[in-house]
Amino acid sequence: IRLTRGLAAAIDHPEVAGLLALMLLHHARRATRTAQGGRLVPLAEQDRGRWDTRMIAEGVEILQAALARDRLGEFQAQAAIAALHADAQTAEETDWVQIVEWYDELALLTGNPVVRLNRTVAVGEADGPRAGLAALAELDDSLPRYTAVAAYLHERDGDLATAARLYSEAAGKAANLAEHAHLTRQAARLNALKK
């Protein structure tokens, strides 16, 4: 963050400001992303009272100034998504419709399939899990975390058996031990509910 602050002071460009805003908004949640033992804490379960509100306010202020220059770039769009998450007092208050709109912008800017994958989660929250699953069906199922997203959306749709199976499958494809443990716990939780 310190280096990006220096870069932003030296280079007056909205994308440099967007990067700084994105870094601040993500860093503001650092203390709540993991629990003891390195256990991952999903965004919806994070203690928002422990988020760094000063850092969030600074990130939002920098983002607003960058967006006002009307030269949208990838980092600004990512920061806008992070700001919408940070703005919600509870997970339920998240403005998923706006987040979908920002993912649409980000997909146009980048063409990145992982952006489209992340968008399916937002669609599932904004329009319901079946809409998210329909959007997911349009993507390549070999994408990293595709199976984890499918599991989450099936769980939200009430199909716990499919979700548990997919969480187990996703755990086998996990990129790291913390993610593997998280997905394994999700599968075990749903399997316990089925009994």
Task: Please identify what each model-predicted range represents.
Residues 4, 11, 70, 103, ...:
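Alpha-helical junction/boundary sensor with strong preference for TPR arrays
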Residues 19, 23-26, 78, 82, ...:
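"A position-specific structural signal for the A-helix of alpha-solenoid helical repeats
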Residues 27, 90-93, 126, 157, ...:
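Structural motif corresponding to the intra-repeat A-B loop/turn of tetratricopeptide repeats
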Residues 8, 20, 100, 107, ...:
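Heptad-repeat amphipathic alpha-helical coiled-coil interaction surface used
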Residues 40-52, 127, 134-137, 142-148, ...:
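Divalent-cation-assisted or electrostatically stabilized phosphate/pyrophosphate-binding catalytic cores
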Residues 1-104:
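Amphipathic helix-loop-helix modules that constitute alpha-helical solenoid scaffolds
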Residues 15, 74, 78, 114-115, ...:
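Start-of-helix register in tetratricopeptide repeats
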